[in-house]
Amino acid sequence: RGLGDVYKRQNFNEVFFTDVRVPDSQRLGKIGDGWRVSLTTLMNERLAIGERPPPAFEEIFQLAKEIELEGGMAIEDGGVREKLADWYVDGRGVTLTRFRSLTALSRGQDPGPENSIGKAITGKMRQDIASFGMDLMDISGAVFDMDNAPMRAMFQDALLSAPSGRIAGGSDEILRNIIAERVLGLPQDVRVDKGIPFSELVKKEKA
């Protein structure tokens, strides 16, 4: 069942499973190893989602060269250049982190928690860039028409779709928790079910 956004597009869905049985021949990994398989799937998804979809630095840099402000071109404004510099540094950091992840995968290693870093940064950065780009356009930023808006309404479209990207594959809050616990080594949340297989939890629930 589709879940529409403010633009009436359906990028999210509710999926219902009733009386589903998966045969053992379709099992991935060893018995009791489902959590590791699930994490591998999630980390690969986060690696893909964190691939800096446009608009990224290149697009906002191009827009700043085309937009004229009261004091001159946007690219010449000190405040604009400061934001561009921040996004450039963040983008390079994400790219290099992705290279590390891809190198590990090429060596047969499991994807690690560092993939959460890229997704956490790019999700917010894309939303911030889209919002800032629309601010630079002034009243043209309110035009959501590919044929008439600057850069074919790329920034307007991104502002509407970016929030969903910050949910898919794990919300910002979940990603920060993973980075804190698995990358920085901070104390984990207290969990009474930690270390207990899901099958055992189900048995206790039925008991």
Task: For each feature predicted by the language model, list its residue ranges.
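Short Ser/Thr-interspersed hydrophobic loop/turn segments at strand-loop and sheet-helix junctions
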Residues: 18-22, 39-42, 183
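Long, acidic (Asp/Glu-rich), low-complexity accessory segments flanking structured domains
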Residues: 20-34
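Short alpha-helix boundary/capping segments
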Residues: 8-9, 30, 48-52
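Alpha-helical interface subdomain recognition
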Residues: 14, 43-207
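Short, exposed interaction patches on small structured surface elements
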Residues: 27, 36-43, 47
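A generic structural signal for well-ordered coil/turn residues at beta-strand boundaries
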Residues: 9-16, 31, 36, 161
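Short helix/loop capping segments that flank catalytic or ligand/cofactor-binding pockets
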Residues: 1, 24-27, 50
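Short, small-residue-biased leader/transition segments that mark boundaries at the very start
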Residues: 2-7
